[in-house]
Amino acid sequence: TVYGLNRIQATTDAYLGLPVDVLGTEHIVLGWPDLMGQLRSEFAVLATEDGTDVTYVPKAKTTSGTEIGVATTTTLNAGEALPVASLNGDLSGSVVTSTKPVAVFGGHECAFVPDDNTWACDHLVEQIPSTSTWGKEFLTVPLKTRSGGDTFRMIASEDATTVSVNGAAVATLDRGQVHQMSIDGKST
């Protein structure tokens, strides 16, 4: 098992690294909204093989000037990365496709979770599984020290996806749409 850690002064986040043999060719980014165009939503794509064509369609304008919904393709070789950051907005729901398996990481420079009323921000990073590995049922368990619940973001890979918590429908999402909520206690 690999545990990735990104630590800088006053902020840290970590993620479970996924092995190369489970990487895929389609990913939908999950990150966090930017804050006033200063603290950015971001993702990165890492190639595992030479000559990998990577296409992304962003859900927010990027710092490189790519407009919302405009497909951009670049070729990466093994070990090369394509970093993408929002100019403003949330890159969650951006679709990344590739001709060969890639690793995709979603996150944020320094997010205020659960909202802007939080007194300090933290860097966020998570390796995003390819859509071919996504499941339909998940269990949540609260962290013992949390007094107000844990924040969850759910994203759909298909149109008309119903999100249910403890058997009750809480949202209907189309591909790339996000539903965010706080959940108290253990849930399914």
Task: Specify the residue positions occupied by each region the protein language model found.
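Conserved functional hotspot residues at active sites or interaction interfaces
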Residues: 1-93, 97-188
